[in-house]
Structures are given as C-alpha cells and as structure tokens.
Amino acid sequence: KSEGRHSTENIDIVPKEGGSGLDIYVKPFTKNENVHIPALITQDGVSEVVYNDFHIGEGAEIEIIAGCGIHNCGCDDSVHEGIHRFFLGKNSKVVYIEKHIGEGDGSGKRIINPQTHVEAEENAYIEMDTVQLKGVDSTKRVSSAKLGPGATIVIKEKIMTHGHQTAE
C-alpha cells in the first residue's frame, strides 16, 4: 500500500492502473532533480511484487534513490520483489542508487529479489550503485540492458551476507 507520492513540475509519479507499482515520468531536459522510491515491509507473511517504470525524457539528468527494508519479527517469511524498468531517452543521464536491508528477531525470513531492466536510446547513460547492507536472508538479483548506439551502463553492486544468508 502506497503511503504517499510527491510529483514536481518536471517529474510525475503515477500509480499503475490495476497493478502494484508506479510509472515515473521525467520531462525532457530536466536537470538536477531526484526521485525517492522507498519500500518498507513491517509485517511477517507479506509477499509483494512491485513494478516501477522510469520513463526518462531526452537530455534529462537525474538521480533516483530506491530501496527496500524488511523488518520481520514474526515466524512467516516476508518477500519483496521490486521490478524496475528504465526507459532512457536520447542523451539522458541517470544515477540510480538502491539500498536493501533486513532486520527483526523473528524466525521468518527476509527475502528481497530485485530486478532491473534498462532500455537506453542513443548516448544515454545510467550508473547503478546497489547495496545490500545486512539482514537479508535470501536475494536473487536479475539485471538486463538493451543499449542503443553510444549508450552506457555502469553497474556497481555490493552484497553483504553472513551465516546462512544466500545471494545469487
């Protein structure tokens, strides 16, 4: 359940019709703005799939900050599957920062399975800096990209696990 959204003159955040997630539209040539897309699960037994699509206009330069935290003190697993798709217009530039964390002293697992898919037009650039901080029992990360001429994707990924935690 979404608790709130804030659009600006250049960035429109729209809930998906008939589904879970958002469409984020960034107007062409938008500069020096940022978008925050947090997710938080505070109950055990929750399983959600969220689809967020970022439509970045030509020549736009923005920063997107996203992430999920699961606080699970119960005995049933909690799962967040965030599927983010980026549609980058010609000559656009995106810095995408994503952080995940799990906590809680229950026996239920904290599972986060992110997917990131990029379609970049000519000379578009996206830098993805993703971090899994701690406490996530299981994660399966999937990334894909379809790049136009001169387009660039840079992926920096840090995943911290301990004990019986797994990451793929």
List the predicted regions and their residue ranges:
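Conserved beta-strand/loop scaffold segments within soluble protein domains that form the structured core
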Residues: H6-E168
